[in-house]
Design a protein with these regions (language model features):
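Terminal-proximal interaction/regulatory segments of ATP-powered molecular machines
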Residues: 337-349, 353-370, 375-383, 428-434
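Conserved ASCE/P-loop NTPase catalytic core
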Residues: 2, 8-18, 27, 33-308, ...
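Conserved C-terminal helix/linker of AAA+ ATPases
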Residues: 43-55, 345, 366-406
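Glycine- and Gly-Pro-enriched alpha-helical subdomains that act as flexible
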Residues: 317-324
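Interfacial loop/beta elements and low-complexity acidic/Ser/Thr-rich segments
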Residues: 407-411
Length: 434
């Protein structure tokens, strides 16, 4: 039976529950991963056939949903039947020869270990050592690897720095093109049961001399790429100038006059400023090369998408509807302490406004909530009464703490009122019946 996530719509549906907005980006990622999983399914029956894996570049500022996208994909890795792992580019170097840095190839140790976890979750450990090793290797070879801070390895700086970064990019290129890498030795201990004696014993399986092959792995690169929009806009402007020049040339810049002379050449007019579309502002291969990446490496990443900065409206929508929003997180924290937290719409708007002002995006929402509610949560520690906390927009603007309602006292008053009303009703009925 084909994996349901070979359907891109099913992947996007999962992303939609947590990552709000960014429709173009989510579609591109969902389609690429679905094709990757479909290729893995196809190779079970036709191992000789290979479809080129589409690697993806996600460009976007801090707090726009890039990391949240990874978290959602990570939750699905057992159903994907392949590891989904994120690594920070800055934690590694090309070969590990620079200032005792860790070589990038060591990421495959973690990939292989995670593949083993997935294998045992799905199939258990009843097979013999060779079968387990083969099964784990197949899962590892289909890994989806996300490399964060990808923009930080762009060629820049002094000669030594450029040399190191070029080495890094060359190493990465070899990985994407397809290469084999040795895995550090490790062991897996399993418990076996003797049916004759009903005794348990431990068996140690040595996983040694193992390799992973990156040919069928998928790579997703993430980065803010600060300033690349200027490169893209400059290119678009130059293209617009060229089109304007060509248009005017087609209308004969040197116009023939009735007297038989040529008039003065007309200057090429500056094109009017235009509002570029989302699709136009996706950096081209040439833009990324100009930013500082090797042409060969860029050519291996055919899918490029941009996560746009989140507006106040988008952040309010996230607070209200995302399953992992900062609002829901703080509601859980208060609930664990026996309290109820409510925010009015104006409060959510103020919180979103602060996050946008700081340039922190969705990532900054939790920080703003912490600043507003941490003291309240501390002061209420150990409180036995049932208290409702109301955070209002006008109180945030005025720098006031949230309102606290003693629900225990309110419940007591309501109960007493109910008893009184019931007693009065009973008395009236007795009088009317008599």
């Amino acid at each position: 039976m084909t994996n349901k996530f070979c359907n891109a719509k099913n992947i996007k549906a999962e992303l939609d529950s947590y990552v709000l907005g960014q429709e173009h980006g989510k579609r591109a990622i969902s389609m690429a991963i679905a094709q990757h999983l479909l290729q893995a399914e196809e190779q079970k029956w036709h191992p000789e056939e290979r479809i080129q894996t589409d690697n993806v570049l996600i460009i976007g500022p801090t707090g726009c949903g890039k990391t949240e996208t990874f978290r959602v994909l990570k939750k699905l890795e057992t159903e994907f039947k392949c590891p989904v792992m994120m690594f920070n580019s800055l934690d590694y170097s090309g070969t590990g020869s620079w200032r005792n840095t860790v070589p990038l190839s060591r990421i495959f140790d973690d990939v292989f270990l995670r593949a083993a976890d997935i294998y045992y979750e799905i199939y258990g450990d009843k097979a013999d050592a060779d079968e387990q090793k083969e099964g784990i290797t197949k899962i590892a070879n289909r890994a989806i690897i996300l490399l964060d801070e990808f923009d930080k390895i762009a060629l820049a700086g002094e000669d030594n720095g450029r040399l190191m970064l070029r080495e890094y990019q060359s190493t990465l290129l070899k990985m994407i093109e397809g290469n084999t890498y040795s895995i550090q030795d490790w062991t897996h201990t399993r418990t076996t049961n003797n049916a004759m004696t009903d005794e348990e014993s431990e068996e140690v399986l040595d996983i040694t001399e193992n390799e992973v092959d990156t040919t069928n792995m998928m790579f997703i690169f993430l980065g803010a790429f600060s300033g690349i929009e200027n490169i893209t806009r400059f290119r678009l402007h130059q293209e617009q100038l060229a089109k304007e020049h060509k248009r005017q040339s087609a209308h004969n810049i040197y116009q023939d006059t009735h007297l038989g002379f040529l008039s003065d050449p007309q200057a090429v007019t500056e094109p009017q400023p235009v509002e570029y579309t989302y699709e136009q502002l996706i950096p081209s291969q040439e833009d990324i090369i100009a930013y500082g990446f090797m042409r060969e490496l860029v050519g291996r990443v055919p899918i490029r998408t941009v996560y746009k900065p989140l507006s106040e409206d988008a952040l309010v929508n996230i607070l209200l509807h995302s399953k992992t929003s900062a609002y829901r997180e703080y509601q859980k924290r208060f609930r664990l302490n026996g309290f109820e937290l409510k925010c009015d719409r104006a409060a959510l708007r103020e919180i979103a406004h602060t996050a946008v002002k700081r340039g922190a995006g969705a990532r900054g929402l939790l920080t703003v909530f912490s600043e507003l509610l941490q003291d309240t949560l501390y002061e209420l520690s150990g409180e036995q009464r049932s208290i409702r906390i109301l955070l209002r927009g006008k109180d945030i603007k005025a720098g006031k703490p949230p309102l606290l309602h003693d629900r225990t006292r309110l419940l007591y008053k309501m109960t007493q009122l109910f008893i009184k009303q019931k007693s009065e009703t009973t008395t009236k009925r007795k009088r009317s019946s008599s």
